[in-house]
């Protein structure tokens, strides 16, 4: 048996990142000082886990504001009103989270919604008809490289394709289905880049799988991951679920070629029953909650 964490709290024991952001918004520190604080915080968190003997340490779980927003930004799901701001990439990202009013423009923040059954709120991704969903960012690999420099091999985490698609708001005339292929291709590119740099494990977080799913939802999930996993080579893929059990889609999950599956045994009332009834792949690692 080995130990793993799905993700580590990012704010800091003394709320370092929150305090640094507030200073940045008040123009009391520079962008470089903010990013340095973030880098030091990531280092501290990785070293804590390493010293605790964690076998599978996660990277890309850090965020200045929200992990869903991070994924949307990584994949160019950025409304035009933010792209038009003549500010840095960091400030565009923060404008999506909290709005921007200044000499370079005036935009409101994206909407916020409750993150499943928690008191946390996420930033709702917004795709317009003109949105070209594709891999454009580098955050995941930059933070993996940071940990690697410390001698720590991590498994990067990213909001999964199904969950991101389901959480996304489509504001134009195009239907949500018109974007499915672009979502899948972007995630295939994420996997390919992880493979290219030698990442050993990639974690897809899919909390949306614990919600009620229609037959159409199941088919969409299977189609998305059949395509993504079709690219699989040496980089292993972990499907991580939480906030309940995956009763509507468990049979489909265990038939796909995931190398690891994370299941919730705390809030997942039927998780043990599902494994007993349908079994679990022999060549797949089971990630469980304590």
Model-based region annotation:
Residues 1-289:
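Domain-level signal for soluble alpha/beta catalytic cores
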């Amino acid at each position: 048996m080995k130990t793993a964490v799905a993700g580590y709290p990012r704010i800091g024991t003394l709320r370092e990142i929150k305090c640094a952001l507030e200073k940045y918004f008040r123009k009391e520190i520079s962008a470089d000082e903010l990013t340095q604080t973030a880098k030091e915080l990531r280092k501290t968190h990785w070293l804590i886990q390493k010293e605790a003997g964690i076998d599978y340490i996660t990277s890309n779980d850090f965020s200045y504001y929200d992990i869903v927003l991070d994924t949307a930004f990584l994949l160019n799901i950025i409304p035009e009103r933010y792209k038009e701001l003549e500010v840095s990439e960091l400030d565009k990202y923060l404008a999506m989270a909290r709005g921007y009013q200044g000499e370079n423009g005036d935009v409101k923040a994206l909407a916020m919604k409750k993150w499943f059954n928690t008191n946390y709120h996420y930033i709702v991704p917004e795709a317009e008809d003109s949105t070209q969903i594709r891999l454009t960012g580098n955050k995941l690999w930059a933070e993996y490289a940071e940990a690697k420099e410390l001698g720590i091999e991590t498994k990067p985490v990213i909001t999964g394709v199904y969950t991101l698609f389901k959480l996304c708001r489509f504001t134009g005339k195009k239907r949500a289905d018109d974007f499915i292929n672009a979502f899948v291709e972007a995630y295939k590119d994420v996997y390919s880049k992880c493979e290219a740099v030698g990442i050993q494990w990639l974690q897809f977080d899919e909390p949306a799988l614990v919600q009620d799913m229609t037959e159409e939802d199941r088919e969409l999930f299977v189609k998305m991951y059949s395509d993504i996993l079709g690219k699989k080579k040496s980089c292993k893929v972990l499907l991580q679920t939480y906030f309940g059990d995956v009763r509507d889609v468990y049979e489909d999950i265990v038939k796909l070629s995931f190398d690891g599956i994370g299941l919730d045994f705390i809030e997942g009332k039927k998780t043990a029953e599902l494994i007993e009834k349908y079994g679990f792949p022999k060549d797949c690692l089971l990630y469980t909650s304590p």
